[in-house]
Structures are given as structure tokens and as C-alpha cells.
Regions:
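N-terminal secretory signal peptides that target proteins for export/translocation
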Residues: 1-13
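Extended interaction regions within the primary functional domain
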Residues: 7, 24, 35
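Bacterial N-terminal signal peptides
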Residues: 16-28
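Sec/Tat signal peptide C-region and signal peptidase I cleavage site
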Residues: 30-34
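Non-globular disordered terminal and juxtamembrane segments underlying protein topogenesis/assembly
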Residues: 186-188
Length: 273
């Protein structure tokens, strides 16, 4: 911001608490108090994976993520963005936009804005990088092709709601000019070997080249997924961060929901997150 087939019954039993946690997180922003912390959660067990080496684990979950990315291109969904600035505990401005998202036969994304209110954000304005975060990084899927640009380091195992997960640190190998990357952590479900949670930010932050050019500071976000037709699709992301602009700071909260997934051919409507 500037200035394979899965048994549905088992799915329901297995992800019930995880989905409940997502639903609880989607209450109005005034009820969200803790700032985003990628280190929060249960005890991190640094024991190596038992059934395979770390390298094999990485290869397998990247292959699954590649399938998720390909599958998601065959769905339409709604992207609902709410950004708020706060003065103490009081909301003093917001930006709200709802967009219908679809993809053509070549995987090219098409956006149709169905609701957009006049922004009243205080102390900040939405930048192109903010919209990149919403479109690309909050619902980020780490495919085999993308992984060539990153160093993935095994961090351990952690219980997330009712799921057992493997945790990886993800850092770009290099930062090429005019390109943006994800930096943070991903949580990989130990059974399905797909990402179920991620936390981090997009990098690099834009360097101010001119004296009067506004600073662009990237907030830390956390994103969650839910099983949609057998794949873990992005459904929710949030930001609760205090952004520092020189000597000034702005408290920002953000909720992004990706919901109403349905197949593009209309043959089957997926359950809403």
C-alpha cells in the first residue's frame, strides 16, 4: 500500500474444524484484534518426515499444487475485498469491492466488478501492488514451475486446527527487476500433500526513487484454503498490520474472500466456503 478421488464423508469429518476456523475468521473486522503473525500456532515439531525424504516430499506437494492450479482455472468465483484503516479501535475509512472472476480456455483471467464503493481510506491508498497481492499472492499456488524461483526449507511439522501439516519456509532465490515474489511460510497437509495455509508478504517493497514519491509498504497476510471438489482452493485471506511510512504509521485490516466456486461449464456447483 502506498502512503486422486477422495471420499466425501471422510472429507467432511476431516476438515470440519478447519472450515469452522475459517468461518469464525470471517466475522466483521471489528472482532479481529490480533495482528498477523506468521509464527503463531501450535508447537512446531522439527522432526524430519518419516515416510519420505524432504526432497521427495517437496516434489510430491509441488506436483499436487500444479494440479490445483490447473483445476482452479476451470472455475468461476467471487472475490470480495474489504480494506479498513483504524484510528485506535475505531474504523475511520474503508475500501470495498466485489468482483466476479473467470478464466478463458487459455487460462487468461477476466474480472467483472459488480460492486465498488467510493474509497474513504485514511493515510493510505490502494496501489497496483495491493491489487497484485489480492489477485496473485493471497491465493498463491506454488507450482513446480514457480518453485524453480524459490528456496524451500523444511521447518517442521505442526498441527493446524484438525490437520497435521508440514511447514516450509519459502524465500525467492533472486529478485529480478520488475518482478514480485512471495516470501513467508506454507503449511502442507500431510495426507493430501496440498497447501492448506500460507503466511507472508510480497517482495520486494518498492523503493522510492524521487523525494516526493509515496512510499509503498507491503502488509503481511495469512491465507487459508478449503476442499472444493477434492482440491484445496484458496477461500480466505486477512491482513491486520501496522504499516510504517517514515515517522507515520497506519493500522490496516483487510479481509479477502474467494467464494461461490462453480465449474465454468455449469455442470456442477461447488459448495460455498
Amino acid at each position: 500500500m502506498s502512503a486422486g478421488a477422495i471420499d466425501e464423508k471422510n472429507i467432511c469429518q476431516r476438515v470440519g474444524l478447519f472450515v469452522l476456523a475459517i468461518v469464525m475468521l470471517t466475522f466483521p473486522l471489528r472482532n479481529v484484534q490480533a495482528q498477523t503473525d506468521c509464527g503463531e500456532g501450535g508447537t512446531l515439531d522439527m522432526t524430519p518426515p518419516k515416510e519420505m525424504t524432504t526432497d521427495v516430499l517437496i516434489q510430491k506437494f509441488l506436483a499436487q499444487e500444479t494440479k490445483v492450479q490447473a483445476a482452479r482455472l476451470h472455475y468461476q468465483y467471487t472475490q470480495d475485498v474489504l480494506v479498513q484503516t483504524l484510528d485506535g479501535k475505531t474504523v475511520d475509512g474503508q475500501f470495498h469491492q466485489v468482483t466476479e472472476v473467470s478464466y478463458d480456455d487459455r487460462g487468461k483471467r477476466a474480472d467483472k466488478v459488480t460492486f465498488s464503493e467510493q474509497p474513504t481510506l485514511r493515510g493510505i491508498q490502494m496501489s497496483s501492488e495491493d491489487f497484485d497481492d489480492i489477485r496473485e499472492f493471497m491465493p498463491w499456488v506454488l507450482t513446480t514451475e514457480q518453485a524453480a524461483q524459490y528456496n524451500l526449507t523444511y521447518a517442521g511439522q505442526q498441527h493446524v486446527d484438525d490437520l497435521d501439516t508440514y511447514v516450509f519456509h519459502v524465500v525467492p532465490k533472486t529478485e529480478e527487476k520488475n518482478k514480485r515474489y512471495f516470501e513467508g511460510r506454507v503449511w502442507v497437509d500431510s495426507r493430501d500433500l496440498q497447501v492448506v495455509k500460507l503466511c507472508g508478504k510480497s517482495v520486494p517493497e518498492t523503493v522510492r526513487k524521487k523525494k516526493n514519491e509515496p512510499l509503498d509498504v507491503r502488509p503481511t497476510f495469512v491465507g487459508y484454503r478449503q476442499i472444493i471438489d477434492g482440491n484445496w482452493f484458496p477461500v480466505y485471506a486477512r491482513v491486520d498490520d501496522t504499516l510504517q511510512f517514515g515517522t507515520a504509521s497506519v493500522h490496516v485490516r483487510e479481509i479477502v474472500k474467494f467464494n461461490g466456486y462453480k465449474r465454468a461449464d455449469g455442470s456442477q456447483v461447488a459448495p460455498k466456503p
